[in-house]
Structures are given as C-alpha cells and as structure tokens.
Amino acid sequence: VNNINADWAKPLDITIDEDQTRQPYILQKIRIGGARRKLQNIRIAVANIKLDIDSCCMGLNGTVVVRNRADFVSFLEAAYNEGKNTVDYLVFPEFYLPISWIQDVLTFTRKTGITVISGLQYISQNGNAHNVITVFSQIKSGRYNSAVLFAREKNNYAPLEKLLVETECCTVLDNNLPIYMVYDDGGVKFGIFLCYEFTDICARALLKNEVDIIFTPENNSDTTYFSNIIETMSRDLHAFMVQANTSIYGDSRI
C-alpha cells in the first residue's frame, strides 16, 4: 500500500479459535471478515473434470505438472461471467490444482469474491507426499479487497491411496491429531472433508450444529458406498453436501 493510502489499510479481518475439547480431534473455527451472505441466495458451481490415475499422481517425486490451463481459465470465466451470473462458491475435485496456479486463484478470488475450494496436486519432498485441500477466500483489509489461502493436509489416507503412493516410492502418513475447520464466511458456515476423511463417523459428528454446507472434493471410484455416506451426512447434520468427483466416476452433485 502506498503512502497516500496507508491510512486506509488495516489488518486482515480473520479470527481463528481452536477448540481442543474434542479430543482426539482439533476443531478450528475461522471467521472471515467480508460482505454478508444469505444462505437462501447462495450459488455453487461444481467443476466437471476428468482426472485419471496418472493425473492424480502428478507432483510425486518431482513429476512435471501438466494440466490444460485453457480449461481452467474457462471454468473461472464461466463462474464469474463478467459479474452477470456470479456464483459464491466454486468447487474442484481432489488432486486438481497445481501449486503453480495458486497465485492465479488468489487473484481471481480477490477480484470476484468467489470462494474456491480445491484439492492440490501432491506435494512431495524427501520421499514424503502430502495431499492437501485448500480454500481461497476474499477478505477485507480496510477499504481494500484481499484474498487469503487456507490449506491443510488430509487427515486420513485411504489404504488404496497409500499403496498407490508407495508405487511411486513415496510415503503418506495419517495425522495423529486430526484437524478439521469450520469457516464462517459472512454468516454462511461451511466445513470441508477431503474424500476418505468422511468415512470417520466421529469426525463427521464434529460438525453437527456447526455448519450449513459441507464441501467434499474427492477422487473416488466407490460411488455407491460414498453416496450412502453423503446422504446420511446431509440428514444427520442438517447440512447441504457439495460433492466434486472426477468425471470418470461421476456422482458430483449438491
């Protein structure tokens, strides 16, 4: 911020409270300052993207990331449509977003106010791989619009995912103290689960009476089993479920 406008700048309006009474879990409650949202007017876009096994393994052992940037830009343009048909939330599947595109998403979110939820491609170093879920949100800084990135690693890895990663000479580890997050975004409260995580019934119970919407990026072939869990969660938690899966397996829905 230049000197002329320095008086307008303020710290980012974020509040994070950590509830450690839910052992063996930690529940973080994050309040994001910004425009008020009305739940009854919320619009959500779910990206329909084909991700095969090779695409999901990008990022392991320094694999060169190859992704169709034109498709990515078209998703962003369709979601915003020059402000004519703006959605509030845009959801991509697990493993979709390359790290090199993070700045592009932050810029998009800052300018449009659209919150983006996506899984990152694997991050690997020294034989350890990390599957990460991200939330990009617009936030106010005085009279300015800014954008912030929230990210956390997957708490529980599926047995098949562990085997798949091992074939690429990497290792993934479950979190001994799982962390889940609830976001208060202008009055709309939402949570996130990354694919296999919501097989944990105790983790699902953490969000009871806490959220209006749950976003679940995933790459999952067992759509029958997971569909039953999704429908059960919606009834038990009285929340909207937003599921973004690879188009190879389908079942992306709200």
Question: What are these model-predicted stretches?
Answer:
Residues 9-37, 128-209:
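Active-site catalytic loop in hydrolytic enzyme cores
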Residues 29-86:
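N-terminal active-site segment of His-dependent metallophosphoesterases
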Residues 49, 94-95, 119-122, 155, ...:
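Active-site-proximal beta-strand/loop segments in catalytic clefts of secreted hydrolases
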Residues 41-63, 151-153, 188-197, 215-217:
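Active-site-proximal beta-strand elements of phosphoester/diester hydrolases
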